[in-house]
């Protein structure tokens, strides 16, 4: 007669282990709780053999709840399909794993009701800390959660929350882009963003763009948000080319994809008709023409820094909220090499 498949067996309990080993449940708890050195060597050896024979696996969640520690970190993201979010998440998860934590990711899909639902769920999971990269349309719920657990923001500032923020030095990234475009001879620059929607990082880029252009005599600027009329708006920009060589500066990967698709559908040549520089560096950029010039964000480092900041708070750091900004890295490709 064969043993029942693992998925149909009843879970072995701590009481069964204690009964078979001939010890108390408290003794078993000491053994699995890391206090083996408090037990007699013979008792510890017997427990090791019984646990192995019965296939006992401690319920880590229950043990964590009893100690007030679940070793779970929550992460709330606005769009799990966004390459930036995926890359940052990878950095967070790597750092979590290195420190013995597990990551619970909740994707709001840019839906306010989903965000509210996930905030409730994360509380029920008893996460020890929370990393937030979302639109933050429920600041009240986030504020209530912050009173109970440490929280760190990624990329987007929420003024209602006095917590650490980890992201990009947006002003420096914009300055690098415009320095490069100006040096390449471009004079008429169109900035393209996803809808601003109160998102602090997008607003910072738009503000830095306008301020930097105003300090550069002979350069002209426009800003537009991607939407249904993008192809027509790009055509209008390109039709008024009397101010000098034209370039487009996209503020993230989503905007870059929308602009590249619109230009290709309109039969435009990236280098001959218009230059293109992108904030974010995605895998497909080198594959378009002679490659798209990009400002790469150190997304992995941003994710790691977000977790490390949260870990510091979990360990008792009660200092003032900090902003940790990383510099972008300019990668020059063919899309900003006028012929």
Swiss-Prot record:
Keywords: DNA-binding, Repressor, Transcription, Transcription regulation. 2-ketogluconate acts as a molecular effector and causes dissociation of PtxS from its target promoter. GO terms for cellular component: protein-DNA complex. GO terms for molecular function: DNA-binding transcription repressor activity; identical protein binding; transcription cis-regulatory region binding. Gene3D superfamilies: 3.40.50.2300, lambda repressor-like DNA-binding domains. SMART domains: HTH_LACI (SM00354). Disulfide bonds: none annotated. InterPro entries: HTH_LacI, Lambda_DNA-bd_dom_sf, Peripla_BP/Lac1_sug-bd_dom, Peripla_BP_I. Residues 12-67 form the HTH lacI-type domain. Induction: Negatively autoregulates its own synthesis by binding to a specific operator site within the ptxS upstream region. Signal peptide: none annotated. Pfam families: LacI, Peripla_BP_1. Homodimer in solution. Negatively regulates glucose metabolism by binding directly to the promoter region of the kgu and gad operons. It also negatively regulates its own synthesis. Contains an N-terminal helix-turn-helix DNA-binding domain and a C-terminal domain that binds the effector. This is HTH-type transcriptional regulator PtxS. It comes from Pseudomonas putida (strain ATCC 47054 / DSM 6125 / CFBP 8728 / NCIMB 11950 / KT2440). The lineage of its organism: Bacteria, Pseudomonadati, Pseudomonadota, Gammaproteobacteria, Pseudomonadales.
């Amino acid at each position: 007669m064969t043993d029942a498949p693992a998925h149909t067996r009843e879970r072995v309990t701590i009481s069964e282990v204690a009964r078979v080993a001939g010890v108390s449940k408290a003794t078993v708890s000491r053994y699995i709780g890391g206090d083996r050195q408090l037990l007699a060597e013979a008792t510890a050896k017997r427990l090791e053999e019984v646990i192995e024979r019965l296939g006992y696996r401690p319920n880590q969640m229950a043990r964590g709840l009893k100690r007030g520690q679940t070793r779970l970190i929550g992460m709330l993201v606005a769009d799990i399909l966004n390459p930036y979010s995926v890359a940052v998440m990878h950095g967070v998860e790597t750092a979590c794993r290195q420190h013995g934590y597990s990551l619970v990711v909740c994707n709001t899909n840019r839906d306010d009701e989903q965000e509210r639902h996930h905030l409730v769920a994360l509380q029920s999971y008893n996460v020890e800390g929370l990393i937030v990269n979302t639109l933050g349309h429920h600041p009240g719920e986030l504020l209530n959660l912050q009173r109970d657990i440490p929280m760190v923001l990624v990329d987007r500032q929420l003024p209602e929350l006095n917590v650490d923020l980890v992201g990009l030095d947006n002003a420096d990234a914009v300055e690098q882009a415009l320095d490069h475009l100006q040096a390449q001879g471009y004079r008429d620059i169109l900035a393209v963003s996803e809808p601003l929607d109160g998102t602090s990082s997008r607003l910072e880029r738009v503000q830095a763009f306008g301020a930097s252009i105003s300090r550069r005599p002979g350069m002209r600027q426009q800003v537009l948000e991607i939407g249904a009329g993008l192809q027509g708006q790009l055509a209008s920009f390109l039709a008024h080319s009397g101010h000098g060589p034209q370039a487009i500066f996209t503020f993230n990967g989503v905007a870059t994809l929308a602009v590249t698709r619109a230009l290709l559908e309109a039969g435009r040549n990236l280098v001959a008709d218009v230059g293109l520089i992108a904030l974010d560096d995605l895998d497909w950029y080198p594959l378009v023409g002679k490659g798209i010039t990009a400002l790469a964000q150190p997304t992995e480092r941003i994710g790691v820094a977000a977790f490390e900041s949260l870990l510091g708070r979990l360990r008792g750091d009660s200092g003032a909220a900090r902003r940790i900004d990383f510099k972008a890295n300019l990668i020059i490709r063919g899309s900003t090499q006028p012929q």
